[in-house]
C-alpha cells in the first residue's frame, strides 16, 4: 500500500492531486515502453525496483499495490476527484474531523468515495455539507515543514 502526499491539516487537496497526477504520468511513460524489455530494465535500475514490478506496472497501467490519497481532503468533491484520478481510497483527518459538521461531512465523504463515478450521487454528497463550516486550514505556502520535504532525500 502507498499513499500520495498531500499536506495534512490544510484543507487544500491540491498537493494530493498534484502527486497522483505525477504518479499517473510516470506510469504512462512506463506503459509507453512496455514492449521494450531493455527500456523496462533501464527504468527498473533507475528506480531501484525489480524488473517484475516495472513489467507488471506497465501491463496493469497502474501500480500493482493499493494507492490511497491523503492530506487536505475536506470535501466529498475532493474525495471523489481523487478516486476519479485512480486512487483506490482516501485517508481523511483534520479536514473532516475538526470541521463543525464532522459527522455529516464524514458520511458525505464516504458516500462520494463509494460512488465517485456517479456525478448525481457526488453532487448529493456535496450538498450534505455546508462549506461555511469547512475547516479553513493552513496556507501551504507558509508551512515550516511540508510533508513532501520530510525524511531523507533520494
Identify the meaning behind each predicted range.
Residues 1-13, 72, 85-106, 154:
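Glycine-rich phosphate-binding active-site loops on the catalytic face of alpha/beta enzymes
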Residues 15-18, 29-32, 36, 83-85, ...:
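Generic preference for flexible, low-structure residues
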Residues 28-47, 113-154:
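Extended, intrinsically disordered, low-complexity segments
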Residues 41-96, 148:
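Active-site/ligand-binding-proximal alpha/beta "capping" segment
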Amino acid at each position: 500500500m502507498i499513499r500520495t502526499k498531500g499536506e495534512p491539516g490544510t484543507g487544500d487537496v491540491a498537493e494530493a492531486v498534484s502527486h497522483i497526477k505525477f504518479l499517473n504520468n510516470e506510469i504512462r511513460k512506463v506503459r509507453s515502453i512496455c514492449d521494450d524489455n531493455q527500456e523496462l530494465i533501464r527504468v527498473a535500475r533507475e528506480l531501484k525496483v525489480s524488473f517484475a514490478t516495472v513489467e507488471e506496472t506497465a501491463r496493469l497501467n497502474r501500480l500493482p499495490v493499493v494507492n490511497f490519497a491523503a492530506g487536505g481532503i475536506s470535501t466529498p468533491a475532493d474525495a471523489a476527484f481523487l478516486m476519479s484520478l485512480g486512487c483506490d481510497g482516501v485517508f481523511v483527518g483534520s479536514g473532516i474531523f475538526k470541521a463543525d459538521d464532522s459527522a455529516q461531512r464524514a458520511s458525505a465523504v464516504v458516500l462520494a468515495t463509494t460512488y465517485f463515478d456517479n456525478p448525481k450521487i457526488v453532487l448529493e454528497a456535496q450538498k450534505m455539507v455546508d462549506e461555511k463550516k469547512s475547516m479553513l486550514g493552513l496556507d501551504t505556502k507558509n508551512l515550516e515543514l511540508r510533508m513532501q520535504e520530510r525524511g531523507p532525500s533520494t
